[in-house]
C-alpha cells in the first residue's frame, strides 16, 4: 500500500475531535475496511465451481486481513510521527480500532 492509497483510505474514517472525551463517528455511513479492500482486489469471480470459490474466498479473506493489518500499521506509524503526545496518538489509534470493530459487528461483516 503506497502513501496515496493510505491517505485516501485514512480520509474516509472518523478521527478524534478537539474534545479528548469524544470521537467523531459516522457509524451509519462509515466505510468498512473489508469492503474497501475487496473492491481494491476486484471482487470475487462467481463463474467458477464451488470448491474454487471457497478457495478463492479463503485467499481473499486472508488478503483482506493482510491489507487491513498493513493499513493499521501505517496508521499507527502516521499517528506516532504526527501527533505530539504519544498517549494521545495511542488513544486515537485505539478509538479507531474500537469503532471499526464495532461497525463490523453491528453490520455482520465478519
Swiss-Prot record:
Which ranges form a coiled coil? Answer: 45-88
Residue ranges of region Disordered?
A: 1-68
**Keyword Coiled coil included in the entry's annotation:** yes
Domain of life where this protein originates: Eukaryota
Skewed-composition ranges (Low complexity):
21-30, 47-61
Name the UniProt key words of this record, in alphabetical order.
Answer: Coiled coil
Q: What is this protein called?
A: Putative uncharacterized protein DDB_G0289159
Report the source organism.
Dictyostelium discoideum (Social amoeba)
Amino acid at each position: 500500500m503506497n502513501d496515496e492509497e493510505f491517505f485516501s483510505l485514512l480520509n474516509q474514517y472518523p478521527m478524534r475531535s478537539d474534545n479528548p472525551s469524544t470521537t467523531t463517528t459516522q457509524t451509519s455511513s462509515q466505510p468498512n475496511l473489508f469492503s474497501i479492500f475487496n473492491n481494491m482486489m476486484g471482487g470475487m469471480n462467481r463463474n467458477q465451481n464451488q470448491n474454487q470459490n471457497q478457495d478463492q474466498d479463503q485467499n481473499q479473506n486472508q488478503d483482506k486481513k493482510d491489507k487491513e493489518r498493513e493499513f493499521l500499521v501505517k496508521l499507527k506509524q502516521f499517528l506516532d510521527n504526527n501527533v505530539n503526545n504519544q498517549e494521545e496518538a495511542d488513544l486515537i489509534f485505539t478509538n479507531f480500532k474500537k469503532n471499526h470493530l464495532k461497525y463490523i459487528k453491528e453490520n455482520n461483516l465478519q
